[in-house]
Amino acid sequence: MDENKQKALAAALGQIEKQFGKGSIMRLGDNRTMDVETISTGSLSLDIALGAGGLPMGRIVEVYGPESSGKTTLTLELIAAAQRVGKTCAFIDAEHALDPIYAKKLGVNIDELLVSQPDTGEQALEICDALARSGAIDVIVIDSVAALTPKAEIEGEMGDSHMGLQARMLSQAMRKLTGNLKQSNCMCIFINQIRMKIGVMFGNPETTTGGNALKFYASVRLDIRRTGSIKEGDEAVGNETRIKVVKNKIAAPFKQADTQILYGQGFNREGELVDLGVKHKLVEKAGAWYSYNGDKIGQGKANACKFLRENPAAAMALDTKLREMLLNPAELIVEEPILSEMPQEEEL
């Protein structure tokens, strides 16, 4: 660039910073805030599938799946993990179905968790926006998008048609929320439900509620499904669960995590550690015996898990080794939302 252009650019940058504040424009290489901070999901397998060690701060995340697949459990596990590292969390319970006893069992500090049960979708999204703008909240969970009912629909009659009303409400909310969440480095997780499209002969008939806006604005989209039951004798004690990373703007997408959700306990962390440890040669398996660092830790997977549960220092050391081995920061992609890619009103 010649000298005159450099002077003109410097003057323009100075004028922009004077008018809009320092940091309003910068060179990409100078932006230290591009390093994305993440919070663990509570599942090592999912953290590895996400590629960054967890879900990103300052971004919108969508978690969707069929009923009883583990969507709320996943978000409560993340809240518990966030609280353990000193983060402040809020739960906007539009479904009016949050169970504090279950949340406590998963490790959530319910005395510190902010909870709102709004009457309308607009109220829920305004509360979310106000919390984000405060700069004091680190994680907001909205459960669920399908329960964000527009005020006009609540005040209307049962048979009234409200075509596209919820989609327009969400589209407007996304435009407001995205910048506020980024500025305050606050993560917002939307739990969503699945619906079936009518008349689809080929391809996947499933879709999520609330229009297209959330799909565009979300940096990460997770599809969570129950794949089987875990039984002890004849009694079901948990679910085999598969979580697919359908969209990922911070690392490579389309990876998946297979994990277990135990009733009343959440993710089977010790089971994940044993399975991943064996797969990556950190835990030795000879017959039915499992060994770690040359010491036998149990006969059978259940006993190996019990050893790790009773020895948290050994479990933490194994977790750290696996994260160092499987999470490569060089693979991270940091992709900011591009306004021109966002859906316009007619695309809802």
Swiss-Prot record:
UniProt protein name: Protein RecA
Positions of ATP binding: G65, P66, E67, S68, S69, G70, K71, T72
Gene Ontology BP annotations: DNA recombination; DNA repair; SOS response
Gene Ontology molecular function, alphabetical: ATP binding; ATP hydrolysis activity; ATP-dependent DNA damage sensor activity; damaged DNA binding; single-stranded DNA binding
Record carries keyword Nucleotidyltransferase: no
Family: Belongs to the RecA family.
Entry keyword set: ATP-binding, Cytoplasm, DNA damage, DNA recombination, DNA repair, DNA-binding, Nucleotide-binding, SOS response
Disulfide bonds: none
Keyword Nucleotide-binding attributed: yes
Purpose: Can catalyze the hydrolysis of ATP in the presence of single-stranded DNA, the ATP-dependent uptake of single-stranded DNA by duplex DNA, and the ATP-dependent hybridization of homologous single-stranded DNAs. It interacts with LexA causing its activation and leading to its autocatalytic cleavage.
Subcellular location: Cytoplasm
A Gene Ontology term for the protein's cellular component: cytosol
PANTHER family for the chain: MITOCHONDRIAL DNA REPAIR PROTEIN RECA HOMOLOG-RELATED, RECA
Lineage, uppermost ranks: Bacteria, Pseudomonadati, Pseudomonadota, Gammaproteobacteria, Vibrionales
